[in-house]
Amino acid sequence: MPIGVPKVPYRMPGGQFTDWISIYDRLYRERIIFLGRDVDDEIANQIIAVMLYLDSEDPGKDIYLYINSPGGMVTSGLAIYDTMQHIKSDVVTICVGLAASMGSFLLAAGTKGKRMALPHSRIMIHQPSGGTRGQATDIEIEAREILRIRHQLNQIYANNTSQPLAKIEKDMDRDFFMSAQEAMEYGLIDRVIEERV
């Protein structure tokens, strides 16, 4: 039986009364965003909107993006990535559990020096996948686009990890799993959190 979204008490600054709000709304007020599902257009739009709002409120203050995601749509993930690069606020990324596929891409996209994972987290990189049906020309167009996106993602991973592009291409050819420590050595994150930040 699902428990739904938990509610927590919150009193607005200067307010007289306490309201019950969703735990995610409460976390947003502390500049914490939680990505705990597949990356799709809906969650991407929500994350982008919150990032833009928080950045406009206080552009010098860090935004925390906690990630426990198996990945998802490349275009949705790239929209979040572009927003992270666009805003003035540093984005601290923290893997809690799993950051796979587009989840690991966003983890590595955090501000350098502020990319972290909990000790028992798993991180996985791989090439993008896609599927299409139809006429041969449609399949050819889709294949060219997937190859273009794969090259783009490989280039960004190489920039964010300081790994040679050839190594990234080889490692991403199939699912490549890493522990938090291995991800740090690889350059996807900057540190493993052993104690509370």
From Swiss-Prot:
Superkingdom: Bacteria
GO molecular function list: ATP-dependent peptidase activity; ATPase binding; serine-type endopeptidase activity
Residues at the active site: 101 (nucleophile), 126
Keyword Cytoplasm found: yes
GO biological process: protein quality control for misfolded or incompletely synthesized proteins
Compartment(s): Cytoplasm
EC code: 3.4.21.92
Reaction(s) the record says it catalyses: Hydrolysis of proteins to small peptides in the presence of ATP and magnesium. alpha-casein is the usual test substrate. In the absence of ATP, only oligopeptides shorter than five residues are hydrolyzed (such as succinyl-Leu-Tyr-|-NHMec, and Leu-Tyr-Leu-|-Tyr-Trp, in which cleavage of the -Tyr-|-Leu- and -Tyr-|-Trp bonds also occurs)
Assigned GO CC terms: cytoplasm; endopeptidase Clp complex
Keywords: Cytoplasm, Hydrolase, Protease, Serine protease
Similarity annotation: Belongs to the peptidase S14 family.
Subunit structure: Fourteen ClpP subunits assemble into 2 heptameric rings which stack back to back to give a disk-like structure with a central cavity, resembling the structure of eukaryotic proteasomes.
Function in brief: Cleaves peptides in various proteins in a process that requires ATP hydrolysis. Has a chymotrypsin-like activity. Plays a major role in the degradation of misfolded proteins.
HAMAP family: ClpP
Record-given protein name: Probable ATP-dependent Clp protease proteolytic subunit 3
